[in-house]
Amino acid sequence: MDDVVAIRNAADTRPRLDLQEHLADLEAKGLLVRIDHPVDKDTELHPLVRLQFIGGIPESERRAFLFTNVVDATGRRYAIPVVVGAIAASAEIYSLGMRRAVGDIGAAWLAAIANPIPPVRVAAPQCQEIVVTGDALRAPEGGMKLFPVPISTPGFDSAPYLTATLCITRDPDSGIQNIGTYRAALKATDRLVVRMVARAGGAGGFLHWQKHKERKEPMPIAIVIGAAPVAMFTGAQKLAIDVDEIGVAGALAGRGVPIARCTTVDLDVPACSEIVIEGLIDTGKLEPEAPFGESNGYVALEAF
């Protein structure tokens, strides 16, 4: 049965709806470097990957990296691997995630935005095979401390950061969800600080936060780590505020994205997500968040 599934998946030329299948595609094409040697997430991991962007390496030689033996500065080993650069480290990697030639990607985006495909709800999602709640989240070595969250720019960043996220929120007035890629600083085993940029026109998540703040109520949020490339692409794309990105992701994929209802908040997430963090944002509280080393080569410093 597994062989039959593998053959069918290989023959399907549509974009993958499972990150694991996408990683297998990258590895098959020589676009994924697997590193089994111990790598320190606090001092080595991101600087190692960043060398291919600042070290004069041609874009055609850029690769995704899969770190299978992650440790921290204290020597702690993590059971969860870390993948970096698997979505858009190069035009070739992005093209593979879209399953389209580079020259066809722009037209594919326009068509997907104009013709979204609704998601498909599933009852027993992969992302809920293991659910951790309550006291287990607050255990000294439990909760999100089990995640090998890297320090992106050692010596500058104020905390370990989740960066390749899908932060999912819902407009309390219209009910339309938004998916945005916002960084999240790990502050405790059960607490993150999320930065939703108040850009021109307003980032969707930030506008939702404003509405919940006006209502004097917390804002439900789901943070997805490790989703299908088409979903990850929409999180970073600047779409109209009233557009539900998951429908655009479905159009890019050529079929509805499987989704599942969260276990503790009224939000839908991609069913094949590797990790989903569910929670509430306290709209009555702000915290200092920067500095943070940005992807385009500068350190963001903000006054609070």
Enumerate the predicted regions with their spans.
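Extended, highly charged
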Residues: D2-F304
